[in-house]
A protein has these predicted regions:
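Non-catalytic interface/linker regions that flank or bridge core catalytic/transmembrane domains
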Residues: 1-155
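Catalytic-loop motifs flanking and including active-site residues across diverse enzymes
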Residues: 69, 162, 199
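Short amphipathic alpha-helical segments with coiled-coil-like heptad repeat character
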Residues: 137-140, 174-178
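Histidine/acidic-rich helix-loop-helix segments that form or flank divalent-metal centers
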Residues: 148-156, 175-193
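Amphipathic alpha-helical
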Residues: 158-168, 173-174
């Protein structure tokens, strides 16, 4: 079921991309009037481009050239508020074999992941990482709970989705959005805490 859902997400992104494409003649006219506005480099990396407000690959071998890019693409999309181009998503899923022990222990990859995890909109990017398989391959313990069901009154989603929603809930508490319902923990989260120590176990 998860594979079907993941493929559907890629297909929907592709259909939306095709729907948003202007007619060829109009596209050429706009390109002449506003050169360089449709495709440009992503701020912070030469390996990715912005393609119709979606992050895409500057070259087909960016992941093979530097496997850290499998994590970096998500952080850059998060920082620049970009959606994901379907071609990029498809290439990510085909490059999962590059996520090995060396990448899991890479300082830069771990730094980027922790920045993703502790950002305000972490759940959006974590969910996309999960859909492409990157999250489960990068954090092997998480990979074991992907698509796992627990049949009781407290679990309406798969365990992996519940974990991602827990990160979202923790972020809401930290922003003070649950002050009325959870005053004590809200005050604690506003104090001097190690955010990495708090967020990582929740995931």
């Amino acid at each position: 079921a998860k594979d079907v859902g993941d493929l559907t997400a890629i297909l929907c992104a592709r259909l939306e991309e095709e729907h948003n494409k202007p007619a060829p003649v109009l596209s050429r006219m706009v390109a002449r009037l506003r050169p360089g506005t449709k495709r440009r480099r992503v701020n912070g990396s030469d390996d990715f481009i912005v393609d119709n407000n979606r992050i895409n690959l500057a070259a087909p071998d960016v992941f093979k050239h530097d496997p850290v890019n499998l994590i970096r693409i998500f952080r850059l999309a998060q920082q620049n508020n970009l959606a994901f181009h379907p071609d990029a998503m498809r290439t990510v899923t085909r490059s999962l074999k590059l996520i090995n022990t060396q990448l899991r222990e890479n300082d830069e990859a771990n730094r980027l992941f922790m920045e993703i995890l502790t950002s305000d909109n972490a759940e959006v990017v974590l969910r996309r990482m999960n859909e492409t398989g990157v999250l489960g391959h990068f954090i092997r313990a998480f990979g074991k709970i992907v698509s796992m069901m627990q049949f009781n009154m407290y679990h309406h989603y798969t365990v992996d989705e519940h974990s991602i929603q827990c990160v979202a809930a923790l972020s809401e508490i930290e922003r003070g959005e649950q002050l009325d319902d959870l005053p004590t923990v809200s005050r604690i989260m506003k104090g001097k805490i190690n955010r990495r120590v708090i967020y990582l176990p929740v995931l």
